[in-house]
Amino acid sequence: VSDGSTRALSRHLKRFSTSVDNLESDYLLEFFENVIATTPDTGDWFPRIEFREQLPIGEQLFFRLRHAPVRTQTCILWSLDELDPRQNPTVKGPDLSACQKLRRKANLHGADEAVILDGDGFIADGALSAIVWWRDGVLCAPDESTPWLPSITRELVFELASQAGHDTRTERAKPEELANCETWSLSSLQGIRGVTSWQNIPMGKHKMLNSFRKRLMMLSEG
């Protein structure tokens, strides 16, 4: 949230709703309304809503108002050197602590984000972001053969690409197969970040980055 403007808020709330479908809709709607009303109209914020299943019904939803961390236009990636530790990779929340640890591990290697690979070395997801790349003018992302969290930002970026006349596809790819490809890390906080370094893999130039960052920013609504 930046000065009261958000991007695809309804999609984020819908994704949260589908992951807690055992809650009454009226209770959930009232909670969402309180979250929106409580979030300030000025400043940069990174609100977080939580569902704690172990608590009594009626006391399971929590709202945390957090200041937004610093945003950057580029980032450095590091491939995780262990098996995917996520237990529920297609639902946002249950694996958050584990993914935060992966990012901290990437930081120790001089990177901003860890990239999770499947058992065969194919790209699955970023620890706290979605990974996409441009190959021969086509915007690509991991396919359904690897588990990845449904990313609202990935969804929006793919829509923007299609609207601009670009082809999109999903595919299986290993990090080294992205040599000389323009590669991005996507998240609701950072938007689109161009990857400048990924261990010893040469990264492609950021030919599409600025135009897509501008288009994504234009989707923000007050």
Locate the predicted segments by residue.
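Helix-start/capping segments and mature chain N-termini
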Residues: 1-38, 44, 52-222
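Dinucleotide-binding Rossmann-like beta1-alpha1 core, especially the glycine-rich loop
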Residues: 48
